[in-house]
Amino acid sequence: MIRIKNLSVPYDETRTPTELAAERLGVSPCAVHGVIVVHKALDARRRNGAPIRWNYTLDVTADGTRGILTRLRRDAQVGRAEEHGPLRVPPYTPQEGRERPVVVGFGPAGIFAAWLLARAGAAPLVLERGQDVDRRTRDVAQFWRTGRLDPASNVQFGEGGAGTFSDGKLTARSRDPRMNEIIEAFVAAGAPEEIRYLQKPHIGTDVLRTVVKRLREKIIEMGGEVRFGTQVTDITMRAGRIAALTVNGAERIPARAVFLGIGHSARDTYAMLHGAGVHMEAKPFAVGVRIEHPQDFVDRMQYGAAAGSPFLPTADYALTFRDEEGGRGVYSFCMCPGGLVVAAASEEGHLVTNGMSNYRRDAGTANSALLVQVTPTDFGGAVLGGIDFQRALERRAFSAGGGDYRAPVQAVGDFLSGRTGTKDFVVVPTYMPGVRPAALGTILPDACSASLARALRHWEQRVPGFGAADVPLTGVEARSSAPCRILRDAVTMQSVSAAGLYPIGEGAGYAGGIMSAALDGMKAALAFLERIQ
């Protein structure tokens, strides 16, 4: 098979990959028998007037492969395609007296730890404090409609984790070949095939709900068991290793291998683990607000005159700013093209935002978190101090919104000048169950507000309209990542203080996003399987 790299074509190119490959290789399309799109990325930088283009990597099956490779041997962009074999999964051999492994949490890390363990024949038991995705979707919809929060079933807790109510982005920095196993599992469960090759793949919250349900069904089919409404409320240790779990304050489950994928919002579980002697540390995170624009503004910002073309995807953006005066980084995060701002609280009397898009990204509005870095020195460095810091922000936001889960909202111009009252926004804030004008600067810490203000002024200079006076800001965004890290050995992936306990994913402080969390869960499961061989 031949690999063609860096095949660049206009964004509105209508020829098929087969025709493009044939032209690049100098053969007739009839000589090409198969083309796999390995990678497809949009170059919309438009530097020095350059047009927008798609860049492809293609794997091609063609007549006369040897001759083609010989003829093009000096062409650095054409060569023989690499081939990767399937992931080797060490088999699990049940032994008398050996408890089956337990997975705590059914977000991306927990799902793929359980998926790999089940594939190996280990028949894992999954314990998820929240509800299955169908019930969870109903509970969340009721919260958004009425303001009645279920602390056990919400945007943070339940099947699929917090990512179920997000944009479903599958971007990752890692080039680990095991990522392909995750992508293929998603596709087999109903995700669009384009996630195999797009540079910025996403599933969308609407499709993701079906995908996570099918992954659960596959785990059960392979011998696993999944229990919902089952919260781990205590752990038992013996001689420095995990021995058992207590669920819902009553049932005791013997366990000598526990994969801890609790998510970044399991604050009560963090406290329980810390009290039980599991070693943890405070870590940096970030807090801020959500900003919203009309999607066509973002499309014009990125595509210029080509905005609106059916050949181009809904545009996104990524912005960063180093606030030298305040000594903090400020950046956009979890940008949701064609999406909505959603209520993501998991505790009564607390308010937190998040962003969400469907697969088609057709809501007409774009939103992104704008976050300011926070370090342990901002909250005294205590292990659980970051949780207290987050809670204080969320309580202030809840109060500022009126105490009924409406979110505080403020126009950029008012935020920068310290006023409130503007109601004529460039786009109607999408947060449900609604918004209320408030001073976001009184909710965020002074240092964070100052850094955010300087970032908004900087971005408005770079991208006129981004920080315009009538652009709405909705707060508060406080759950971008875990506020602490559960310490683990770099090789065995077990807790440094509790043998047999495998902290995994975003909640353990070792991942950020669906793909990195899923990979972390897989790696921990592989480490366990290799250890017991």
Task: State where each predicted segment sits.
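Residues forming the flavin
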Residues: 1-52, 58-189, 193-533
